[in-house]
Swiss-Prot record:
This is Kelch-like protein 41. Transmembrane segments: none annotated. Ubiquitinated by E3 ubiquitin ligase complex formed by CUL3 and RBX1 and probably targeted for proteasome-independent degradation. Quinone-induced oxidative stress increases its ubiquitination. The modification Phosphoserine is found at S3.
Amino acid sequence: MDSQRELAEELRLYQSTLLQDGLKDLLDEKKFIDCTLKAGDKSLPCHRLILSACSPYFREYFLSEIDEAKKKEVVLDNVDPAILDLIIKYLYSASIDLNDGNVQDIFALASRFQIPSVFTVCVSYLQKRLAPGNCLAILRLGLLLDCPRLAISAREFVSDRFVQICKEEDFMQLSPQELISVISNDSLNVEKEEAVFEAVMKWVRTDKENRVKNLSEVFDCIRFRLMTEKYFKDHVEKDDIIKSNPDLQKKIKVLKDAFAGKLPEPSKNAAKTGAGEVNGDVGDEDLLPGYLNDIPRHGMFVKDLILLVNDTAAVAYDPTENECYLTALAEQIPRNHSSIVTQQNQIYVVGGLYVDEENKDQPLQSYFFQLDSIASEWVGLPPLPSARCLFGLGEVDDKIYVVAGKDLQTEASLDSVLCYDPVAAKWNEVKKLPIKVYGHNVISHKGMIYCLGGKTDDKKCTNRVFIFNPKKGDWKDLAPMKIPRSMFGVAVHKGKIVIAGGVTEDGLSASVEAFDLTTNKWDVMTEFPQERSSISLVSLAGSLYAIGGFAMIQLESKEFAPTEVNDIWKYEDDKKEWAGMLKEIRYASGASCLATRLNLFKLSKL
């Protein structure tokens, strides 16, 4: 049966190709031409049969009782001849040159003349090119041309990135109905409903005189019961526009009662008045007014998780529930990378080596990726200007800092510091570190970058600690660590910089120290249960975790060798001791570890 189907498909493709090529030849040679489409001062010869087969509009036109002369020359008003020419050629060749400059005009004309093949091609093109800068325009186009497939795709794109897109100027130009189509969506990616309210009120104030009259309808799409009662009292009740609107004051009264636990009786008439229609997926049993809707948005399922990134996948671990979730596949991520999460919860991976054959001057490059947690994929960014390893990563104001390390070509120790600006999408060099160092660690806290330990040019461990102020552009010494070390774990936990394990002049270490940022002093903490290097420390939701690393393990031959371990420990602050949580989590193998916030709604449980 399979061979018969394959043969039938092969014959169909052959016949389709033969027919398409034959039709194009007939058009090129102007054979059997029986009509002309006239747009402006240009006449385009074609065949009624082809137009009728591809367009219900033209089929009805040519089968109508219209005078024969009008069928021979069809005059099309308000049509760009260049766009029409592209569409006609597509009907004969199945090829069209779509670009950002012509796709909307082609889309509109295909919609007007009911040419589904061109229409579908345009929709697919626009869906693939959805971006923060054009998604609202594409949403508007989908609604205007009554194309649910495109409008829904654009709306979902906007919903996923609502916090970013609601700040754009295009958002402020949305019509009331366009705004409602966005904020009524259950899938809105907001952690707090307060963000929706603030976006709506900013939209109103952009054109207050005209938009106040639409506010009552838009108001129904905001899910006030998802807000804190304090925020509702301080910001919603006291808003001057809301206070001056009698209709909204009635709704405020109902909402105040709802916060007090008194809901109105559901009414079948609510749906008829439109008050319940904006809630999206509500049924007949949910006929309370829209502004009483308390269904959580999809973005409200965000949780603090430990992200483990290796060369296979990025996996999020929930230590409270002992569950793992697939965040993204990571086959392009190298093993020897470093990772960082910014204050804005943006996740970056830096490092690893590849050869850029087109760059003759500097063929060796280091990878640089950013995680798109919505699309669950890694986005390539401009590589490091100089390939290096054993460096430290810091972040201030969304800028990424790569501090010192080793040059991958010369193996020389480095003191240079590179800064990546995501707005300009460029790397720049900033103030050098006072010493050349590698195998150190870097941590950021409250707008400052701290560089700790590592090995210097003489291959000896250092205990020096530096602080970098990006606004002043200078490095300063802080109190040194008690034990010089490299390849250790670091985290900011409860206002202190905690370091654990690492390599010292005597070998692997289990010692743990804490640096008090207010007193500039180091204190000894409870030792980790095992001497380790490359251990990862993560402070998550008030708890400190230690993950993996390398320990000296006795082999069957009775010899000791550095071996990777993939366990998880938790520091119990009240008992001042380390407690084992997981003996092995395989996703930690070769992984960098981060404390981050991710939306469980969009993740797949492993």
